[in-house]
Swiss-Prot record:
Short motif Endocytosis signal, span: 19-22
Extracellular compartment segments: 92-776
Subunit structure: Homodimer; disulfide-linked. Binds one transferrin molecule per subunit.
Compartmental location: Cell membrane; Melanosome
Gene Ontology molecular-function annotations: transferrin receptor activity
This protein's name: Transferrin receptor protein 1
Residue numbers carrying Phosphoserine: S23
InterPro entries named among the record's database cross-references: PA_dom_sf, PA_domain, Peptidase_M28, Peptidase_M28B, TFR-like_dimer_dom, TFR-like_dimer_dom_sf, TfR1/2_PA
Major localization listed first in the record, in broad terms: membrane
Pfam entry (one): TFR_dimer
Keywords recorded for this protein, A-Z: Cell membrane, Disulfide bond, Endocytosis, Glycoprotein, Lipoprotein, Membrane, Palmitate, Phosphoprotein, Receptor, Signal-anchor, Transmembrane, Transmembrane helix
Cytoplasmic compartment residues: 1-70
């Protein structure tokens, strides 16, 4: 037994069981010897072996060092193998359980283990053990179960019996206070944002439209509605009808009428926004614009007169590019989108009387609409004139945007924003009430899931109620302008809830390509209100992307995408062939909205799509953004450019560099996908860096070579101006249709801006600066 103990002692002891006292100082007598005291294993056990009674002066010799080292190596290898097997089996078990949870085939209770993580500043923090993880199938089922159609309709009743919620007025402020209090009941953080803006409102005298025949004046209408940002004053001119006021409509009419200078243009509502119609009329030389609602497209609307605005842009037109904070010293500038011509809306009955008094050529069948007495213009020698008196006045008003937030647990400084317009010129039930109702219900439900069901969103969710939306998304745009330096780096998606139900026949989707894949996935899990046995995805089919409606200036999501470079999503229901007749009128009431079949189910479906989008974007480790979709969009544009290669070369230019830039972007997408596949999914720092590269793709398509003050909508896909890819295509088309009108210097600039914006987006997506170069 003693020999066995001695053997074990020798095996696990690197040094002999002895200690030596060395003389530190040099010995004066030159003796460099040392004294050794040897302790045997037997001594430790208190055995009977005789103890040495003298000190050894000789050095102990190591024994069996080679054999001992061999045993140590074998023991270490065995321990390593055992540890590896234990870790592998444990990890495999967790992965299998996670897979069962994701597809809903098994139980879903996994408790995170504690691990030490390094954040971006280099400090070490311990991840605290939390409650069981809620997996996506369970989370979306919670949302669907908790959403209440009854609550949605109840939230609409706030607008019953109120004639107007005009921005900055008492009813708008009262609604803001109510929303603020509701947010306080549900959310972690609630705050207000004040802006001081210039709005054009009704004057002390009503506007008036009259017709003069041989000097005899007759009043056609004195409408209650106004068009904000119209030029005030009195103007007269010959009436000319230009259908919907599209550019192609003006091209057609200019072949019939020698000149439109000084005329009063008549257009019908639809196809494009009123502001775009007015801009086209101004470009053609018109002195004023009258717009009416045609019952062929809107149903029976003889007496309805819509409100509107004529600013070709968003935000406060008197502080373009600047936030309208009270302490800002504004420069004396105004938006280039202001029309400076008189604009007024009239009823279809007034338009019919006006047409009946015109004596020119009859409209073509495609232009007639519901008014069969439609005339294009008057005879050249006739003395028929239309007079437009506009008495609008400017007012300085304070508006409130209301915000509430659910803070994320892993990346609280990254957030998805859900917003809805609150104000309206009339009752605004469909225009603003439905979106606000969904906003409040989502705030309640998602807060309940977080507080009571244990869901811990990785990223924050911000709920926003905007004011002055009827004046051109003023509240939303001023917020973007005020916090642009922060928002483009932190807000990664905006979900618009405005006007989600304007009909029941068709689904209306407007979105950034980055969110197509997310939306397709969500629609597979939301029931079709028209047939609950199928999903929304089944209703639309696999080619639903082809039905995506481009965002317009009348959508509050537009400045988020085109001005700030934030991916956006807008979802709702409408009738494609018949506009909602009461929109922007005094008839936009709950009673009229109730005429839409299955209203409750439509509201619930729209709310569920928006809620699922917000939850999915805060649930997964990896952001649900499809970066490869923009590569497909670029390829589609490249196919449009191909027919003009020869004509471009004849000008001494080339499209090759533009094509090479697209290739660079595709390679950057492939590289990022490879980095994601090869990364450690459990490393929070790496995950955040990869997500940041994805979330900035949209922003990188804002042309960096343009001033946001002069060209606010800089997005090369969805912006407005000659820098866009669509404008480049239209310019190239002139090479075949009207070569003499091609501006060579502009074409050079367009090619350069497009090429280097795409190349810059590819470089940013590629990662660090040492991973990029300036070669194609």
């Amino acid at each position: 037994m003693d020999h066995a103990r001695a053997a074990l002692s020798n095996l696990f002891s690197v040094e002999p069981m002895s200690y030596t006292r060395f003389s530190i100082a040099r010995q004066t007598d030159g003796d460099n010897s040392h004294v050794e005291m040897k302790l045997s294993a037997d001594d430790e056990e208190g055995g009977d072996i005789e103890r040495p009674e003298h000190m050894h002066v000789s050095m102990a010799q190591p024994q069996r060092n080679g054999k001992r080292l061999c045993f140590l190596v074998i023991a270490a290898v065995l321990l390593l193998l055992i540890g590896f097997l234990i870790g592998y089996l444990s990890y495999r078990g967790r992965i299998e359980l996670a897979a069962r949870c994701q597809d809903g085939s098994g139980g879903c209770e996994i408790t995170p283990t504690a691990s030490y993580l390094v954040d971006g500043e280099g400090t070490v923090e311990e991840e605290i053990q939390g409650p069981p993880v809620i997996f996506w199938p369970e989370l979306k089922a919670m949302l669907s179960k908790k959403l209440s159609a009854k609550n949605l309709v109840d939230n609409l009743r706030w607008r019953v019996g109120v004639d107007s919620f005009e921005a900055g007025e008492a009813e708008d402020t009262n609604m803001a206070t109510y929303i603020h209090e509701e947010f306080r009941n549900f959310l972690d953080k609630v705050w207000n944002d004040e802006h001081y803006i210039k709005l054009q409102v009704r004057g002390s005298t009503k506007n008036q439209v009259s017709i003069s025949i041989n000097g005899k004046e007759e009043i056609l209408e004195t409408p209650d509605a106004i068009v904000a940002y119209s030029e005030s004053g009195s103007v007269s001119g010959k009436p000319v009808y230009v259908n919907y006021g599209l550019k192609k409509d003006f091209e057609i009419i200019q072949k019939v009428v020698a000149s439109l200078n000084g005329t009063i243009v008549i257009v019908r509502a639809g196809k494009i926004t009123l502001a775009e119609k007015v801009a086209n009329a101004k470009e053609a030389g018109a002195a004023g614009v009258l717009m009416y609602v045609d019952s062929l497209m809107y149903g029976i609307t003889d007496t309805l007169i819509p409100f509107g605005h004529a600013h070709l842009g968003t935000g406060d037109p008197y502080t373009p590019g600047f936030p309208s904070f009270n302490h800002t010293q504004f420069p004396p500038v105004e938006s280039s989108g202001l029309p400076h011509i008189a604009v007024q809306t009239i009823s279809s009955s007034a338009a019919a009387r006006l047409f009946s008094k015109m004596d020119g050529d009859t409209c073509s069948e495609g232009w007639k609409g519901a008014i069969h007495s439609c005339k294009v213009t008057t005879k050249q020698e006739s003395q028929i004139m239309v007079k437009l008196d506009v008495n609008n006045s400017m007012k300085d008003r304070k508006i409130l945007n209301i915000f509430g937030a659910i803070q994320g647990f892993e990346e609280p400084d990254r957030y998805v924003v859900i917003g809805a317009q609150r104000d309206s010129w009339g009752p605004g039930v469909a225009k603003a009430g439905t979106g606000t109702a969904i906003l409040l219900e989502l705030a309640r439900v998602i807060s309940d899931i977080v507080k009571n069901e244990g869901y811990k969103p990785r990223r924050s969710i911000i709920f926003a109620s905007w004011s002055a939306g009827d004046y051109g998304a003023v509240g939303a745009t001023e917020w973007l302008e005020g916090y642009s330096a922060m928002l483009h780096a932190k807000a990664f998606t905006y979900i618009s809830l405005d006007a989600p139900v304007l009909g029941a026949s068709h689904v209306k989707i407007s979105a950034s390509p980055l969110l197509y894949m997310l939306l397709g996935s969500i629609m597979k899990g939301v029931k079709n209100p028209a047939a609950v046995s199928e999903s929304l995805y089944n209703r639309l089919g696999p080619d639903w992307v082809k039905a995506v409606v481009p965002l317009g200036l009348d959508n509050a999501a537009f400045p988020f995408l085109a001005y700030s470079g934030i991916p956006v999503l807008s979802f709702g229901f409408y009738n494609k062939d018949e506009e909602y007749r009461f929109l922007d009128t005094k008839g936009d009431t709950l009673e009229n909205l109730r005429k839409i079949d299955n209203l409750d189910a439509l509201l619930a479906a729209a709310a569920e799509v928006a809620g699922q989008a917000a939850l999915r974007l805060t649930h997964d480790h990896e952001l649900f953004l499809d970066i490869g979709r923009y590569s497909e969009e670029l390829l589609a544009y490249q196919e449009e450019f191909l027919p003009y290669i020869k004509e471009v070369r004849e000008l001494g230019l080339t499209l090759d560099w533009l094509f090479f830039a697209r290739g660079d972007f595709q390679r950057a997408v492939t590289a990022l996908r490879r980095d994601i596949a090869n990364s450690d999914g459990e490393n929070r720092v790496i995950r955040r860096a990869l997500n940041d590269r994805m979330m900035k793709v949209e922003y990188d398509f804002l042309s960096p070579y343009l001033s946001p003050k002069d060209v606010p909508f800089r997005h090369i896909f969805f912006g407005k101006g000659p820098h866009t890819l669509r404008s480049l295509v239209e310019h190239l088309q002139l090479l075949k249709t009207n070569r003499s009108s091609v501006d060579l210097n502009l074409l050079r600039e367009q090619l350069a801006l497009a090429t280097w914006t795409i190349k810059g987006a590819a470089n940013a997506l590629g990662g660090d600066i040492w991973e990029t170069d300036n070669e194609f």
